Each structure stands twice: as C-alpha cells, then as structure tokens.
Regions:
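Short, structured coil segments at secondary-structure junctions
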Residues: 12, 95-96
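Short, small-residue-biased leader/transition segments that mark boundaries at the very start
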Residues: 1-5
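Short, structured active-site "lid" loops
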Residues: 6-19
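General beta-strand structural signal in soluble alpha/beta enzymes
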Residues: 17-18, 74, 99-102
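Short, hinge-like loop/turn segments at secondary-structure boundaries
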Residues: 6-7, 89-93, 117-119
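Helix-loop-strand module that forms the ligand-binding subsite of alpha/beta enzymes
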Residues: 15, 22-87, 92
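Glycine-rich phosphate/pyrophosphate-binding loop and the adjoining helix
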Residues: 98, 103-148
Length: 148
C-alpha cells in the first residue's frame, strides 16, 4: 500500500525530491514556500524537527521553514504518548510548529472513518487558509432542553 500512496502523492506534486538530496531547492530559505505539513509525522521525525537534527531533506525543509518563520504543521501519529514524545512536541511548539494530532473529534458528527480523516486534514489545511470542500468547522453548540 505504501507504494500506491507514494505514487498518488507524487502524481499531485510539481516536483519530488529524494530524502537524501540536501542540495534541493527547498533546503534553502531563499526558495519561498508558505510552509509545510508533515503528515503523518513519526516521533523520530518530530524529534529531529524539534531538536534541529537535519539529516534528511524533510527535516532540513522543516528547519528552513522554522528559521524563516514559515508555518510548520506536524501531525504526530504515535499513541499512547510518552513523556519524551510530549517534551518533543512541546519543543516543536516552542519553535513555532503547530501540532495537530489526527485525533478523533466527536463534535463534527462524522459518519465514517474517511470523515474523521478529512476533518483532521481539514484542520491542518486551514492553517494555510485552505478550506477543503465539505469541511465542517465548529459553529457553536446548541443545548437541548434537558441540558438547560
């Protein structure tokens, strides 16, 4: 399945770089981007981003976004979280990253797993001003007569 998703993602991209290509255009702050979303974000990747250990193009691109004050959204995939994971998330947030764990939300009336995934991705895309078609943002709760 991994190769299928990789090919689908590559088909959507203008340019694809191998992870070892630290000389790629996106490894420089002079190459403008709005930022980046790392989804899913392993704890190894989150740790490297949080601690500035730029040993691959992915981490270097995140490092560049952070130093250039561009948006970096991390969607960590681990569960349960250890103290080390939480410390690294805190370090990343202190560096300016936005942490959006792909958690289940129960307030948006999801009907399927796809709805839940799309909601988490919608939250990440909204960080860049992109509102996906059909995305339902919270519009406030309505109390029933029993709740009043």
């Amino acid at each position: 399945l991994g190769d299928v998703y990789k090919r689908q993602a590559e088909a959507l991209a203008d340019v694809c770089y191998p992870p070892e290509d630290l000389a790629a255009a996106i490894s420089s702050g002079s190459f403008y981007t709005d930022g980046m979303i790392v989804a899913p974000c392993s704890m190894k990747t989150l740790s490297a981003i949080a601690n500035g250990y730029s040993d691959s193009l992915l981490i270097r691109a995140a490092d560049v976004c952070i130093k250039e004050c561009r948006k970096v959204v991390l969607m960590p995939r681990e569960m349960p979280l250890s103290r080390i994971h939480l410390r690294n998330m805190s370090l990343a947030a202190e560096a300016g990253c936005v942490i959006i764990p792909p958690m289940l939300t129960f307030y948006n009336d999801s009907k399927s797993v796809d709805d839940m995934i799309n909601h988490a991705l919608g939250k990440a895309l909204m960080q860049f001003g992109i509102v996906p078609p059909g995305f339902q943002s919270w519009r406030g709760g309505r109390l029933s007569k029993e709740d009043k």
